Amino acid sequence: MTGREILEKLERREFTREVLKEALSINDRGFNEALFKLADEIRRKYVGDEVHIRAIIEFSNVCRKNCLYCGLRRDNKNLKRYRMTPEEIVERARLAVQFGAKTIVLQSGEDPYYMPDVISDIVKEIKKMGVAVTLSLGEWPREYYEKWKEAGADRYLLRHETANPVLHRKLRPDTSFENRLNCLLTLKELGYETGAGSMVGLPGQTIDDLVDDLLFLKEHDFDMVGIGPFIPHPDTPLANEKKGDFTLTLKMVALTRILLPDSNIPATTAMGTIVPGGREITLRCGANVIMPNWTPSPYRQLYQLYPGKICVFEKDTACIPCVMKMIELLGRKPGRDWGGRKRVFETV
């Protein structure tokens, strides 16, 4: 298939494995630019020019899991651990709202200390502020998810990382792809807006694996999809591996937009870490969400999923004004509401 034929098939929504694999495999600048343009047009048509701002508070870097790629893994003895108090978390959320955030994202390692009741109490307090609450806390029993939904949580982000069960087990030895999927299906069933997403460039990952990720996202019609490159952390077993490729990751974002026209897709912080201006580029290739770091100092320097993370040493109230300026410079506008998924596209 020629590049033109692939683009025509994508426009006709002929999402065969062959088409997606060819789209990811072609290493041609002209094709890539046409793919990004198509994704941007679909983004504009179905989710518009608003960029939704989700202020993320990383409230604990304690984690019971031992994922091979993650700097928060429990065997990383070089990381100074922290836990924010519930009062600190709520006050930080209040400040984000004052700065204009319409969604608060609470993210942590899998830290049993807060589970489930402390999280419920925090969610209830933040919901009084009139904003959406997204949780990104990992894999927990169904009853925890139920409690948090009853407390008022609106969304849950649980990236599947890779849909290859063998690779998943190798990289995440404490758990399995099956368990991850069961959690995602439970979250959907409970009425959460549910987010998945993958890492690009994982050691041992193939183009076929990336195609499986895209087909998995399409099959389950996720409301949110976060995609970012693998970035090796020096205090993990994958320290010496190669980082994920920016352009290939960008193509995954673009194809996700084409597959899921009205889902919310962030320009992830990792994209801005491996390439200067990477988030802005991603917002021009299908993304419509940005997640400014709202973790207060000194904690923000310690939430080390990967090294070199941007926006860590800036003033800890700089990020929301910064992304608002970024959105303006792109000719877009900040979202005016909670930015939930609006189903305007009928999936075929």
From Swiss-Prot:
Record's cofactor remark: Binds 1 [4Fe-4S] cluster. The cluster is coordinated with 3 cysteines and an exchangeable S-adenosyl-L-methionine. Binds 1 [2Fe-2S] cluster.
Molecular functions (GO terms): 2 iron, 2 sulfur cluster binding; 4 iron, 4 sulfur cluster binding; metal ion binding; oxidoreductase activity; transferase activity
Keyword flag Zinc: no
Name of this chain's protein: [FeFe] hydrogenase maturase subunit HydE
Keywords from the named record: 2Fe-2S, 4Fe-4S, Iron, Iron-sulfur, Metal-binding, Oxidoreductase, S-adenosyl-L-methionine
Record family assignment: Belongs to the radical SAM superfamily. HydE family.
Residues bound to [4Fe-4S] cluster: 63, 67, 70
Organism: Thermotoga maritima (strain ATCC 43589 / DSM 3109 / JCM 10099 / NBRC 100826 / MSB8)
Effect recorded for residue 70 to A: Eliminates binding of one iron-sulfur cluster
Oligomer and partners: Monomer.
GO BP annotations, alphabetical order: sulfur compound biosynthetic process; water-soluble vitamin biosynthetic process
EC top class, as a word: oxidoreductase
EC number in record: 1.8.-.-
Gene3D superfamilies, sorted: Aldolase class I
